[in-house]
Structures are given as structure tokens and as C-alpha cells.
């Protein structure tokens, strides 16, 4: 684990950390109940990089440390255009679905707490979201991550359509 911390420090990235959920879990055995804790953490630099992680341990501080370490290992890049996402997308994970829609400047982040934590730390300022299905915070966070990972940048969209990025933003005028 020291290697991960050294890699993060070596890159010079300064990630903001947020604990989304701390849940006490119980395993019942013939010897009694075993208590442990599950923590959902999000890290991001508010500039297009975000990661989500889950940690489990018998003590809360250990679970938090494990969750933050897992989140730092899972950091990925999010394409952002004018403070929002380039296009609409649906993220799915198990029984949860999260619809992510770009919003005009000044809209803010319209979402529930779990999705808000992920998109805020990614650096998105204007977005509309709608979650349906499961309300489990871990599954919602993973569905949001799946949606953000499947976003295409404006350059990639332009390349696929064989037009310039400016034409993607402003639309292409039809000839004829």
C-alpha cells in the first residue's frame, strides 16, 4: 500500500476526499455476532479525475483508510466541456440506473447525495441526474462511475462523425 501512496505523491495530484457512507454490518455465527464496518469513499481533484472505493474492516478508521486507498487506485479521467458532460448517458450497475444529462451554465448539480459526491469531485458544475432502481449508495456510485467512464470527449465524437469539434458543438448545417 505504501507504493500506491508514493505513486500518487509522485504524480503531484492533490485529491479531495469525501466519505459518502459508513455502514455497520453484522455476520452471525454460532459463536455470536461479528461486527464490522463498510465505508464508501470518493476522491477527486475537481478537474476531471475521480475515483470511488469501498473498504471493509472491524474498526471504522481502518475501513476508511482501505476505502480511500481503493478509491485512489480506481481514479479515471472524465471528459468535461464548459463545466458539464459532453452528452447524455445512462450508467447501470446491478439494479441501479443513473441518467446523466448535460445542463446549461447556472443550473448547478441536480442529484441525490451519492451521485452528487461523485460528480462534484470530478469537477462537473452543471448536470441533471435521475436515479432509478436500487438506492444502495455503493451501487449508485458504481452506476455513476460506469456512466462517466462511457462518456466520449468532443474530439472522439467529432472523429467518429468525421467532422470538427466546433461542428459538434454548434451543429452542422445541411447542404441543399
UniProtKB/Swiss-Prot annotation:
<keyword id="KW-0694">RNA-binding</keyword>
<keyword id="KW-0687">Ribonucleoprotein</keyword>
<dbReference type="GO" id="GO:0006412">
    <property type="term" value="P:translation"/>
</dbReference>
<dbReference type="GO" id="GO:0019843">
    <property type="term" value="F:rRNA binding"/>
</dbReference>
<comment type="subunit">
    <text>Part of the 30S ribosomal subunit. Contacts proteins S4 and S8.</text>
</comment>
<dbReference type="InterPro" id="IPR020568">
    <property type="entry name" value="Ribosomal_Su5_D2-typ_SF"/>
</dbReference>
<dbReference type="Pfam" id="PF03719">
    <property type="entry name" value="Ribosomal_S5_C"/>
</dbReference>
<dbReference type="InterPro" id="IPR005324">
    <property type="entry name" value="Ribosomal_uS5_C"/>
</dbReference>
<dbReference type="InterPro" id="IPR014721">
    <property type="entry name" value="Ribsml_uS5_D2-typ_fold_subgr"/>
</dbReference>
<dbReference type="GO" id="GO:0015935">
    <property type="term" value="C:small ribosomal subunit"/>
</dbReference>
<comment type="function">
    <text>Located at the back of the 30S subunit body where it stabilizes the conformation of the head with respect to the body.</text>
</comment>
<keyword id="KW-0689">Ribosomal protein</keyword>
<comment type="function">
    <text>With S4 and S12 plays an important role in translational accuracy.</text>
</comment>
<dbReference type="InterPro" id="IPR018192">
    <property type="entry name" value="Ribosomal_uS5_N_CS"/>
</dbReference>
<comment type="similarity">
    <text>Belongs to the universal ribosomal protein uS5 family.</text>
</comment>
<dbReference type="InterPro" id="IPR000851">
    <property type="entry name" value="Ribosomal_uS5"/>
</dbReference>
<dbReference type="Pfam" id="PF00333">
    <property type="entry name" value="Ribosomal_S5"/>
</dbReference>
<dbReference type="InterPro" id="IPR013810">
    <property type="entry name" value="Ribosomal_uS5_N"/>
</dbReference>
<feature type="domain" description="S5 DRBM">
    <location>
        <begin position="15"/>
        <end position="78"/>
    </location>
</feature>
<keyword id="KW-0699">rRNA-binding</keyword>
<dbReference type="GO" id="GO:0003735">
    <property type="term" value="F:structural constituent of ribosome"/>
</dbReference>
<protein>
    <recommendedName>
        <fullName>Small ribosomal subunit protein uS5</fullName>
    </recommendedName>
</protein>
<dbReference type="InterPro" id="IPR005712">
    <property type="entry name" value="Ribosomal_uS5_bac-type"/>
</dbReference>
Amino acid at each position: 500500500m505504501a507504493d500506491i501512496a508514493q505513486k500518487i505523491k509522485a504524480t503531484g495530484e492533490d485529491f479531495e476526499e469525501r466519505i459518502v457512507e459508513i455502514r455497520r454490518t453484522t455476520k452471525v455465527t454460532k459463536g455470536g455476532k461479528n461486527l464490522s464496518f463498510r465505508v464508501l469513499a470518493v476522491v477527486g481533484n475537481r478537474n476531471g479525475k475521480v475515483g470511488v472505493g469501498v473498504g471493509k474492516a472491524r474498526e471504522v478508521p481502518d475501513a476508511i483508510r482501505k476505502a480511500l486507498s481503493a478509491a485512489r487506485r480506481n481514479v479515471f479521467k472524465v471528459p468535461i466541456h464548459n463545466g458539464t458532460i459532453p452528452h447524455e448517458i445512462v450508467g447501470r450497475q446491478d439494479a441501479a440506473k443513473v441518467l446523466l444529462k448535460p445542463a446549461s451554465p447556472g443550473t448547478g448539480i441536480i442529484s441525490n447525495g451519492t451521485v452528487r459526491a461523485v460528480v462534484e469531485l470530478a469537477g462537473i458544475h452543471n448536470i441533471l441526474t435521475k436515479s432509478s432502481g436500487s438506492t444502495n449508495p455503493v451501487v449508485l456510485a458504481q452506476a455513476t462511475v460506469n456512466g462517466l467512464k462511457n462518456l466520449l470527449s468532443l474530439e472522439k465524437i467529432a472523429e467518429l462523425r468525421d467532422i470538427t469539434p466546433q461542428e459538434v458543438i454548434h451543429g452542422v448545417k445541411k447542404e441543399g
